[in-house]
Amino acid sequence: MLSKKSEGEGQILTFFSMASAVGKTVLAVNFAAALAERGFRVCLADLDLQFGDVCNYLALAPEQTLYDYSEANEATRNAAAFVTPTAFGFDVLAAPKELDEAFIMNADIVSSAVNQLQAAYDFVILDTTTGFSAINLSLLELTDVLYLPCVVDFIPSIKNLKCGIDTLHKLQFDWQRVRLILNRNKAETQISVKDVEALLGRPFQYFIGNDYRGVTQSIKEGKPVVLTDKDSRLADEISNVFSSELGEQEESGGFSKWFSGLWK
């Protein structure tokens, strides 16, 4: 369960995948918006360094990026000074604008930035690139909760997911900190979800339906669907994920929050 840590130590929520086009960035953006709406200080870091799309999804034109942070004086720089505010109550640490700027990034630079953001925000959401790169491995070490969005309408994606889960086990990553999210649930496919769960040896914790039109419209407008189309099925299903993670329980027509430690 998600909860605010002690002052100066925010939670790090990482969105990670073993395949492209599984909805990772859409979910990361909407998680950031939902947490910010609830009054938390939130920063979304776009760590898909070469081809990050967070700013495109939010219609942002950042003046500073992670590259500018890397070029600043190492002794005095603070990642929180390089973020871009959004109209939705959270900040974004943007990915480098140019490919050659992304090439100089390394695990030390990225981890340092994330640690500094952790000291300034209640939640730091990481939208990572695909695969087990050196940078991603360093981010896994910092992660409090790891979200793995996936789809089951494409066999190579299932194969990659199985490989990724096996790798997490080899890395001895604490499975209590992992959330499997089936995106595009009930899309047209001949593949059984139960068969996929049997292959993975793990059940999906969350299911999000297939709404290509809703996602496309959200990206076109540069607005998170959980804020702009709250009555849609897509927004409702995404909201169910973070409501469950926050431990929100419906009482008397509203929501009450209760917080406890992540794992006791």
Stretch-by-stretch model annotation:
Residues 59-64, 166-167, 197-198, 223-225:
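Short, hinge-like loop/turn segments at secondary-structure boundaries
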Residues 108-112, 118-119, 123, 128-206:
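Conserved catalytic-core segment of NTP-binding enzymes
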Residues 1-12, 170, 177-178, 182, ...:
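Acidic-aromatic/histidine active-site loop/patch
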Residues 184, 197-225, 238:
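Beta-strand-loop-alpha "switch" segments that mediate conformational coupling across diverse proteins
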Residues 9-53:
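Walker A/P-loop phosphate-binding motif and the immediately C-terminal alpha-helix
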Residues 49-50, 98-100, 153-155, 185-188, ...:
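Conserved nucleotide-binding/hydrolysis micro-motifs of P-loop NTPases
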Residues 72-132, 137:
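Cytosolic-facing regulatory segments adjacent to core modules
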Residues 35-92:
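Phosphate-binding loop that captures ATP/GTP phosphates
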